[in-house]
Amino acid sequence: MTIDAIKIHLQENSKDLTNEFKRLFHGRGGLYEGWKNLTVDSIDTILSVALYHEEENESELLGMLQEFIQTSQHTSIVLQRRYLKGAPSEVIVGEIPENVFVVENGMKIKLNLLSNKNSGYFPDMKIGREFVRENSKDKSVLNLFSYTCAFSIAARLGGAYKVSNIDMSKGALSTGNQNHHLNDLEMLGISFHPYNILKSFPRIKKKGPYDLIIIDPPTFQRGSFEATKDYQKIIGKLPQIASEDCLLLACLNSPDLDEDFIKQLIKELAPSFKF
């Protein structure tokens, strides 16, 4: 796929843009030959670009993107080089405001586009957040690996009366708290707990049982979680913390493990859950 073809693709996908987040180019999906290491996102007036591997024609690509925003709604470009140590980000065109947030189905989530690694928002779980919003009315929700708590916001907007957010990162939970206030949500029943999930099930169980459980871990986090050996530990605890009619949203962002990995764990360790 040529760089000119990418530009045409971006223009086609930009015709119906609003202030809501939209992925304009998803090279990571493996559908565009030669560009599996490129993603381009629209965040209101910001064009957010990520490179997962060094590109020989990077300067030509960036030149095309600068041409593209001349006729799009974007006024700035942020580039993240995820292949470099620390995954540094920089503003290469224009300026970005001090406070940036993404909009998803009317829900606001605070972003840090210049942070290392992750910005605070994972667009691939949009459909998951829609599911939670549609299925959380009058439910007690457990949000494991909550990070900046987007699932919690979706649950409260959907009518959950209680949400317990569990994550090791106090900083992420603090941002999650801010995200709730950003959406003008009632905080009664919303809690934030900086627990090591694998070591804290007695405390998690004490706050149950739960009517909706969300598991959205990293594939690998040094010293705290490794999907291939630790996911089963969480699945095995589900019968102890789930209500009789509990819904489970089990997620895993791994290029090496497919849905059968999770299905088999549930079949073996929590057979009361049915697909």
Please give the residue ranges for each predicted region.
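Conserved class I S-adenosyl-L-methionine
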Residues: 138-147
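Non-catalytic accessory regions of SAM-dependent methyltransferases
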Residues: 1-44
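C-terminal substrate-binding/active-site "lid" region of AdoMet-derived donor-dependent transferases
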Residues: 229-275
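S-adenosyl-L-methionine
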Residues: 168-214, 223
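Conserved SAM-binding loop of SAM-dependent methyltransferases across substrates and taxa
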Residues: 148-160
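Conserved SAM-binding motif I beta-strand of class I
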Residues: 162-167
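Short strand-turn motif at the edge of the Rossmann-like AdoMet-binding core
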Residues: 217-218, 224, 251-255
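Non-catalytic substrate-recognition/targeting regions of SAM-dependent transferases
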Residues: 31-34, 38-41, 57-122, 130
